[in-house]
Regions:
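PRPP-associated nucleotide enzymes
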Residues: 1-207
């Protein structure tokens, strides 16, 4: 579940789900790239492990991209928001790279589709000009934030943009990603096969 924190009088659905599983006799839970691993505090006396997919992403980059230079002069790891900092820090440490992050500036006077709309993506980090960048996140939902972040990096002079995410949902289809690829905003999107991958997705040149 993505709902790892409460807003107002909402229920904490992820915690409730974990507690119901343990009430049915489950002793240990293994998941992949939990949206927030701290949710295991809902079942402190049971086993809970969140498996990172960092190795799979690094393996593809090393085997699938020939002219990649993995050093801090040529590459940088980017977190698309403050919630994914831990994931990006780990990825950057494994590869020995610098890290940057974006934070979402929202308009809290409005609610659109149940959320406060994002006004701008503000960047915190060193210069990305001329560097390949890896945007690391746990999921692509509609993909709007990922494309916005990639666009901001391109405006700042980034060379190639690779998006690595554990779960590729693509809830609004692939059109925006096709356009982003054609316009040179993104070069490659990496996901795992932990959820269903339609044939249309597998045939995309950017996937």
């Amino acid at each position: 579940s993505r709902q790892h924190k409460r807003s107002g009088r909402e229920s904490l659905d992820c915690a409730l789900m974990l507690q119901e599983l343990t009430d049915m006799g489950v002793e240990n839970i293994i998941t992949f790239d939990a949206h927030d691993p701290r949710v295991h505090n809902a079942i402190p006396l049971k086993g809970f492990e969140s498996v990172s997919c960092t190795y799979q992403f690094i393996k593809y980059l090393l085997l699938g991209v020939d002219d990649l230079h993995i050093d801090s002069q040529h590459m940088m790891v980017i977190s698309p928001d403050e919630g994914g900092m831990g994931r990006a820090v780990y990825f950057a440490n494994v590869l020995g790279l610098d890290m940057g992050m974006f934070y979402k500036r929202r308009d809290y006077t409005k609610i659109i589709n149940g959320r406060n709309p994002i006004v701008a993506h503000e960047f915190l980090g060193s210069n990305v000009e001329g560097k390949d960048v890896i945007i690391i996140d746990d999921m692509i939902s509609s993909g709007e934030s990922m494309i916005d972040v990639a666009s901001e990096l391109k405006k700042r002079g980034a060379s190639r943009v690779f998006c690595a995410t554990t779960f590729g949902l693509f809830t609004n289809g692939f059109k925006k990603f096709d356009e982003a690829y054609e316009n040179g905003v993104i070069d490659k999107i990496l996901t795992t096969n932990l959820i269903y991958q339609p044939e249309e997705l597998l045939s995309k040149p950017w996937y």
